[in-house]
């Protein structure tokens, strides 16, 4: 069975990103973006997915974290899409509901070739988390879902602490990814015979 992995390098005037992803890993994760909360969220998602991930990013954090986080999302999605190839034989769908103290989030995905982010309940998030606007996390997942060509639904059900809500969603994303990328059968899981 071939190893599902990918390496991505992206260099722009705003960011420089290098990452290596192994889908069938052991949860060995090393992330350095220069923005601690992004490192934490990405580490949680990759660990709970069982991925091995090495990621380094240098970005224009003197402006804010937007370019860094969005570009990292794009690169992560690109790496996942490349590692999965034609997506033949994967379970394709995954979902998880994860608590973190008082917070609860639902995450559902379909690695269908149809990019979409549905982002609900973000009014529960405080306007600023770790010094950045809450919209940053929607942009991160929008970039990830688009580049990975997946349908991604994140719903914050309840909670008061922004960190806890994001952690709940990050773990949920990881668990949903673990289910969706699982090798399930030899054929493409689609009645139409295509995932685009």
UniProtKB/Swiss-Prot annotation:
**What are the protein's UniProt keywords?**
Amino-acid biosynthesis, Cytoplasm, Histidine biosynthesis, Lyase
Q: In which pathway does it act?
A: Amino-acid biosynthesis; L-histidine biosynthesis; L-histidine from 5-phospho-alpha-D-ribose 1-diphosphate: step 6/9
Choose any GO biological process term that the UniProt entry carries and state it.
Answer: L-histidine biosynthetic process
The Gene Ontology CC terms held by the record are: cytoplasm
Main localization is cytoplasm
Molecular function (GO) terms for this protein are: imidazoleglycerol-phosphate dehydratase activity
Subcellular location, record wording: Cytoplasm
Q: Does the keyword Ligase apply?
A: no
Note the PROSITE patterns from the entry: IGP_DEHYDRATASE_1 (PS00954)
InterPro entries from the UniProt entry = IGPD_sf, ImidazoleglycerolP_deHydtase, ImidazoleglycerP_deHydtase_CS, Ribosomal_Su5_D2-typ_SF
| UniProt keyword Lyase present | yes
Q: Which reaction does it catalyse?
A: D-erythro-1-(imidazol-4-yl)glycerol 3-phosphate = 3-(imidazol-4-yl)-2-oxopropyl phosphate + H2O
Please list which residues make up the signal peptide: none
Return the Pfam families for the record.
IGPD (PF00475)
Provide the disulphide bond pattern: none
Q: What is its EC number?
A: 4.2.1.19
Which family does the UniProt entry place this protein in? Belongs to the imidazoleglycerol-phosphate dehydratase family.
**Name of the protein:** Imidazoleglycerol-phosphate dehydratase
Q: Which organism is it from?
A: Nitratidesulfovibrio vulgaris (strain DSM 19637 / Miyazaki F) (Desulfovibrio vulgaris)
List the lineage, top down. Answer: Bacteria, Pseudomonadati, Thermodesulfobacteriota, Desulfovibrionia, Desulfovibrionales
Protein encoded by which gene: hisB
